A protein has these predicted regions:
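Short, acidic, metal-binding catalytic loop of nucleotide-sugar glycosyltransferases
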Residues: 28-39
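Conserved donor NDP-sugar-binding/catalytic core segment of glycosyltransferases
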Residues: 100-129
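Acidic donor-binding loop at a coil-to-helix junction in glycosyltransferase catalytic cores
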Residues: 157-164
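Cell-envelope/extracellular polymer assembly enzymes that use nucleotide-activated donors
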Residues: 8-11, 41, 163
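Conserved nucleotide-sugar donor-binding
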Residues: 84-86, 135-150
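Short beta-strand-to-loop acidic/aromatic patch adjacent to the donor-nucleotide binding site
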Residues: 85-94
Length: 275
């Protein structure tokens, strides 16, 4: 068990645009973390000019911009530059993390690791957990020094994440972390919640790119009165008790239970094999 003084400082990086309802669950996930307050931060970059997000908390920094980035890669680079830590968690605005997630990060992201994938994570579809399994590139953790070494995120839209991850893999230090299923901590939220770039395919010549498609979707919702504009005070909350859902799912499907918090478990269970 690591002492607080030995724990790494972790920066949770979140980029967002017009998805307050999802973002509030993401922020709440951060606030629930069982991790020293002086060892973590949440950086939120909002480039939806019609909204100014507000939330007063010493560990949460929100940057509201008056312009929209032309590529997601540029936005990711801007947000990464703001991160104080060398260990950076991708903290998507439409995903959820269990309270022991940063303890998992500290446990598995050792000094020789530059990029970490979760195998397993929690696959959440619609309004239910459907599997505890490999979740691809969702919730990756990477090292800022490695990000700098490869030149940052590529200046791309749809598909930028694959390019970035492939470059990090080539750089070295790839890890597939294998927490016990009962202690999986990153929820990949898929289906029935919001516009999801992963389901929209790659950009194609002559057609609107990912930024343009998402902007049009948000504008349509705004015109329907479904999106607030101006100053928006965030009210972090979870719509469901995701920890309880996870405990019930794991016990019913696998017959196991989470009997202790992650930071009480001293043995690392990791794999460097591609799932």
């Amino acid at each position: 068990m690591q002492q607080p003084s030995e724990l790494p400082f972790i920066s949770c990086k979140c980029i967002t645009y017009g998805r307050v309802d999802m973002l509030e669950e993401s922020v709440n996930s951060f606030l629930k973390q069982d991790y020293p307050a002086d060892k973590c931060e949440l950086i939120i970059v909002n480039d939806y000019p019609l909204q100014k997000l507000k939330f007063d908390h010493p560990q949460v920094k929100i940057v509201n911009l008056d312009y929209t980035f032309s590529t997601i890669g540029e936005k990711e680079n801007y947000a990464t530059e703001l991160c104080q830590g060398d260990v950076i968690c991708q903290w998507d605005d439409d995903d959820v993390a269990a309270p022991w997630h940063l303890q998992n990060v500290a446990k598995y992201f050792t000094d020789d690791v530059n990029i970490l994938h979760w195998n397993p994570g929690v696959f959440y579809n619609g309004n239910a957990i459907t599997d505890i399994t490999w979740i691809g590139n969702s919730g990756i953790v990477f090292r800022k020094s490695a990000w700098k070494a490869i030149g940052g995120h590529p200046i791309e839209n749809a598909g930028y994440d694959m390019t970035f991850i492939e470059r990090l893999h080539k750089h070295g230090g790839r890890l597939f972390a294998e927490p016990p299923k009962a202690e999986a901590s990153w929820f990949y939220m898929w289906g029935g919640r919001s516009y999801h770039m992963s389901g929209q395919g790659h950009d194609k010549p002559g057609q609107p790119n990912a930024i343009q498609r998402h902007s049009a979707h948000v504008e349509n919702l705004r015109q329907q009165g479904k999106i607030s504009t101006g100053d928006v005070e965030l009210k972090p909350h979870w719509k469901y008790d995701y920890v309880q859902m996870l405990d019930i799912f794991v016990k019913s499907k696998y017959g196991t239970s989470r009997t202790t918090t992650v930071h009480d478990i001293s043995q690392k269970q990791v794999s460097r094999q591609i799932p």
